[in-house]
Each structure stands twice: as structure tokens, then as C-alpha cells.
């Protein structure tokens, strides 16, 4: 397949491009500078994406967006989080809709943050949306993909959970503390963490290129855990204690209250119902299996 990818230099994008190329696909990257071979230049802020450059494409995968946990949520960064998703998605979806030879599938990024903090409730793709900042961002983000589906292109909304990889994200940030025996649960540890290994994240995305699935798909492992379970499992895998709970005031002072709450002290108990129904077979269905594989323990 000829596959165009935005966000190819990101944490998920790099691994995805590598696997797709290993499997014989022709991958073309969207870049915001002068394009080299195997690249297409675009400028989302200026609304520039040449539809003719996408002709002959079998699939488009859209993964770009400002990092949720990269900076404190100032009003300007909140706007960047939103617009880096909505403007880019709108441009790609509308460009696809205008093409003479449209791709067969559009896989567009989203996140399980769309459900908001929900306590013990088990959440699937048909669950209602939440009312938090991230829920609002995700809802608008998904809405901008609609022109592609309205034009008859199979559109999948990739509601990604916490992606585990030692190369970046939450696991990379926590690992040094746990290796020193300084890890601990956040607050009471009862908040749910719906995680997925990087191998299953990219495996599921590749699976969805051809699976007969459209609409929202939760990209999470089938066995979410509480933060206390995550903490004890990671400590066991690295063979270090993790006795000291981390009180809310410390992360909130560093990250800001809203960001700390969203990333550390609230969560969602998400089930990948659509992915399971599609026949995808998880490489790492449980957390301990995933961590031992990722950390080579």
C-alpha cells in the first residue's frame, strides 16, 4: 500500500513508519519544510496541502498534534493543543474529500481523553463523551475528520490510551525513579490507567488499514489497571521497592493542577471493544507481559 503519514517523526509515528516499511509498504511523510524524496510538504496554518500530491494514495494516517504533557497548560498552550489537532485534521479531511481518486481509508488520531474522568465505569466506543478540557479537545478533533467520511472514505478515529515504550512518554519519565527504588503510586492509586504497548499500538494501526472497521476505535490493551497495580507491577519487573505514595501537591506544583489531574490523578477504565471484535490479536494483553517485553526483563 502507498500510505501517507503525518506526525511521522513523533513517538508513535517513528515506530509505525519503520514497521510499515519493513512490511513492504510505500510510506510518504507529510513535512513542514521543503520536501525530500518520500515526502510531501504541507503548511496547516496556511491551509496548504496539494491534493494532487496525494493522488494514488491507498491510506492516510494522521498522527500529528502538540504533546499533551510537554508544557504547563497556559491559555496559549491549551489553544496550541487544540488547534494543532483541529486545523491539521480539517485540512487533511477536506483535502481527501476533494480528491478525484480518494484513499480507501483515513486513520485519524484521537485519544481516550474523550471520555473524561469516569471512576470505575467501564468505557467502550459507545460510551458518552466527558466534560473535561481534553474531552472537549478530542470531540472537536474527531469532528474535523467528518468531511472524509462524508465523502465515502472509511474513516477510523484512533482513540489512543497511554502508550508504553521506554523510548518516550509516561514509561520513560517514570522508569528512572522506579529503578532507584523511588517510585510510588499517585495519590490513593485507585485511578484507572488504560495503557497499550507500543508494539500493539502500531500493530493495531496497521491492522486497521485493512480491517472492516470504521468510526471510533479504542487503542488500549484489554486489561486496564489501577495506578496502584501499575506501580506494583513496574516495581516487580525492575526488582525495586515502590512504597512511597506521591501526594497530589508535589506534581500539581510542578505541572499545574489541571495537567497533573488529567495525567496522574484521574483516569479512564477503557475496553477495546471494537478492536477485539475486529479480530486483532494483542501481542501484550497484560501489563506485566508488556513491561517485561519492553524492558527486556
Regions found by a protein language model. Name each.
Residues 3-23:
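N-terminal Rossmann NAD(P)H-binding glycine-rich loop of SDR-like oxidoreductase domains
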Residues 41-88:
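NAD(P)H-binding glycine-rich loop region in Rossmannoid oxidoreductase-like domains
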Residues 90-132:
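Conserved Rossmann-fold NAD(P)-dependent oxidoreductase catalytic core, especially the SDR/UDP-sugar
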Residues 110, 143-166:
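Conserved beta-loop-beta element that borders a ligand/cofactor-binding pocket
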Residues 139, 151-153, 164-173, 207-217:
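Glycine/proline-rich active-site loop of Rossmann-fold NAD(P)-dependent oxidoreductases
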Residues 175-183, 191-225:
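Alpha-helical substrate-binding/gating segment
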Residues 210-258, 292-297:
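Mid/C-terminal beta-alpha module of Rossmann-like enzyme folds, strongest
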Residues 262-297:
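C-terminal amphipathic/interface module of NAD(P)-dependent oxidoreductases
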Amino acid at each position: 500500500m502507498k500510505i501517507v503519514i503525518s506526525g511521522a517523526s513523533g513517538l508513535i509515528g517513528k515506530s509505525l513508519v519503520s514497521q510499515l516499511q519493513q512490511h513492504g509498504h510505500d510510506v510518504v511523510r507529510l513535512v513542514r519544510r521543503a520536501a525530500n524524496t518520500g515526502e510531501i510538504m504541507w503548511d496547516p496554518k496556511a491551509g496548504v496541502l496539494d491534493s494532487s500530491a496525494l493522488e494514488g494514495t491507498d491510506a492516510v494516517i494522521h498522527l500529528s498534534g502538540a504533546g499533551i504533557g510537554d508544557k504547563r497548560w497556559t491559555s496559549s498552550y491549551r489553544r496550541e493543543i487544540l488547534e494543532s489537532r483541529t486545523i491539521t485534521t480539517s485540512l487533511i479531511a477536506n483535502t481527501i474529500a476533494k480528491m478525484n481518486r480518494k484513499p480507501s481509508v483515513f486513520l485519524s488520531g484521537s485519544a481516550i481523553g474523550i471520555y473524561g474522568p469516569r471512576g470505575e465505569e467501564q468505557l467502550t466506543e459507545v460510551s458518552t463523551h466527558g466534560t473535561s478540557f481534553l474531552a472537549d479537545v478530542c470531540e472537536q478533533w474527531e469532528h474535523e475528520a467528518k468531511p472524509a467520511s462524508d465523502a465515502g472514505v472509511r474513516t477510523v478515529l484512533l482513540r489512543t490510551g497511554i502508550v508504553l515504550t521506554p523510548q518516550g512518554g509516561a514509561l520513560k519519565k517514570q522508569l528512572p525513579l522506579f529503578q532507584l527504588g523511588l517510585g510510588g503510586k499517585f495519590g490513593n492509586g485507585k485511578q484507572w490507567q488504560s495503557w497499550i504497548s507500543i508494539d500493539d499500538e502500531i500493530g493495531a494501526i496497521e491492522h486497521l488499514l485493512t480491517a472492516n472497521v470504521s468510526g471510533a476505535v479504542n487503542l488500549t490493551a484489554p486489561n486496564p489497571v489501577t495506578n496502584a497495580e501499575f506501580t506494583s507491577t513496574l516495581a516487580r519487573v525492575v526488582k525495586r521497592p515502590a512504597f512511597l505514595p506521591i501526594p497530589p501537591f508535589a506534581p500539581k506544583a510542578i505541572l499545574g493542577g489541571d495537567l497533573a489531574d488529567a495525567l496522574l490523578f484521574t483516569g479512564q477504565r477503557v475496553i477495546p471493544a471494537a478492536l477485539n471484535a475486529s479480530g486483532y490479536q494483542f501481542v501484550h494483553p497484560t501489563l506485566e507481559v508488556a513491561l517485561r517485553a519492553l524492558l527486556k526483563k
